Amino acid sequence: MRSKIKLSLIANKTSRRTTFRKRKGGITNKLHELTTLCGVKACAVISSPYENPVVWPSTEGVQEAVSMFMERPATEQSKLMMSHETYLQDKITKETKKLESLRRENRESQLRQFMFDCVEGKMSEHQYGARDLQDLSLYIDHYINQLNSSVMLLTNNGASSSSFPPPLHTSVAGAGAGAGAAPLVVAGAGAAPLAVAGAGASPLAVAGVGAAPLAVAGAGPPMAQNQYEPIQPYIPTAFSDNIQYQAPVDFNHQIQHGIYDNLSLDPNHQYPFQDDPFMEMLMEYPYEQVGYAAEHAHIPFMNGNYYNYHQPPTVGLTTTGHMPSNNATTTTTTNTTVV
């Protein structure tokens, strides 16, 4: 990377002459590019102690350009005229403005720190003069005016803090959580609500005013927490040739073992239908001793093909307790279900 050249007279005569020769060629090349690309009139006269004065592009060209310049009004002639003295004066003015801007920014930063120290009670740590206190007072007034302007702007635009709705106050935990708690309804009509608020708290309405709660599932009996409901496969008999089954699901494990395990772990009768005679019989005797049809109600698959299997109609499932077999001969066994 080339270093910035210092604009001062070169002390060495040989170096000064070499620099003159190089820069003279550069100036003439730039003038040629300017006149060719932009279609303007330009000329240059370079006088030096090393050689005769250099005129570009020619003597006639210089006279023509000078004549066009002299025909201009005096104000236009001196409007963009730049000499060495005016160039230096322009640079000094620009640097002075930059210095004043930096001083103003530093003073504002210092006054801002003074203001925060006053708020925190740290004024005794600094030595303030009369001018500092006066500037601090003016800065605080200016800061307050800016805050008032911002508040008025937000108020006029309708974005004040009073326009926002109040926050929703819901207590998630409390001493009386459970009994009498207002529900958060997530199921259809008739479903047991899920209590998430304290006693007497208002429910969180999801649906419109006067509308039914947000239905996530169909209407059904109440379900307790951590309960497995038996899954009954839907097998239509009229369209058995058009049904394609996906990946297998072990319904026997969910129907047989899941519900009995849950029932066996329930000493406090927290599950529904505990007073039903049939449920008491199931809890008293293992399902191996009862003719439970679901023990054999599994869905057969053909050679492990779970995707393109056409399920035959399930006729007689309620009486036999078996799904129709895919073998050539089907043996029917009647199991007695105790009700």
UniProtKB/Swiss-Prot annotation:
The keyword Coiled coil applies. GO terms for molecular function: cis-regulatory region sequence-specific DNA binding; DNA-binding transcription factor activity; DNA-binding transcription factor activity, RNA polymerase II-specific; protein dimerization activity. GO terms for biological process: positive regulation of transcription by RNA polymerase II. Gene3D superfamilies: Transcription factor, MADS-box (3.40.1810.10). One of its GO terms (cellular component) is nucleus. It comes from the Eukaryota. SUPFAM superfamilies: SRF-like (SSF55455). Signal peptide: none annotated. Residues 1-60 form the MADS-box domain. InterPro entries: MADS-box/MEF2_TF, SRF-like_MADS-box, TF_MADSbox, TF_MADSbox_sf. Keywords: Coiled coil, DNA-binding, Nucleus, Transcription, Transcription regulation. It is found in: Nucleus. Residues 86-112 form a coiled coil. Probable transcription factor. Interacts with AGL61/DIANA and AGL62. This is Agamous-like MADS-box protein AGL86. The gene is AGL86.
